Swiss-Prot record:
A Pfam family recorded for this sequence: Ribosomal_S16
Domain of life: Bacteria
Gene Ontology biological-process entries: translation
Xref: InterPro entries: Ribosomal_bS16 (IPR000307), Ribosomal_bS16_CS (IPR020592), Ribosomal_bS16_dom_sf (IPR023803)
Transmembrane portions of the chain: none
GO cellular component: cytoplasm; small ribosomal subunit
Name of the protein in question: Small ribosomal subunit protein bS16
Disulfide bond residue pairs: none
Native organism: Acinetobacter baylyi (strain ATCC 33305 / BD413 / ADP1)
Alphabetized UniProt keyword annotations: Ribonucleoprotein, Ribosomal protein
Protein family (similarity comment): Belongs to the bacterial ribosomal protein bS16 family.
Annotated PROSITE patterns: RIBOSOMAL_S16 (PS00732)
The UniProt record lists the keyword Ribosomal protein: yes
Organism classification: Bacteria, Pseudomonadati, Pseudomonadota, Gammaproteobacteria, Moraxellales
Entry keyword Cytoplasm: no
Length: 85
């Protein structure tokens, strides 16, 4: 099954997540099909916290990809921010 989930990067105690489309059998930080955004939970000040390519997200969901709970909430947050801006 194709899923949309977070792949962890960054340093110890300083997480940085890529939002990736991957096969559910692949490792969390392993091989992926496409990178569609990022999430930086430790962003401060003017640093960008979340970027998500909404068109690609919608495309993959229409193809049957299942977003994780966290990615679904981040997508809703990104959509809300896009309509406010």
């Amino acid at each position: 099954m194709v899923v949309i989930r977070l792949a962890r990067g960054g340093a110890k105690k300083r997480p940085f997540y890529q939002i990736v489309v991957t096969d559910s059998r692949n490792a969390r930080d392993g091989r992926f099909i496409e990178r569609i955004g990022f999430f930086n939970p430790t962003a401060q000040g003017q640093a960008e916290k979340l970027r998500l390519d909404a068109d690609r997200f919608a495309h993959w969901v229409s193809q049957g990809a299942q977003p994780s709970e966290r990615v679904a909430s981040l997508a809703a947050q990104a959509k809300k921010a896009a309509t406010a801006a």
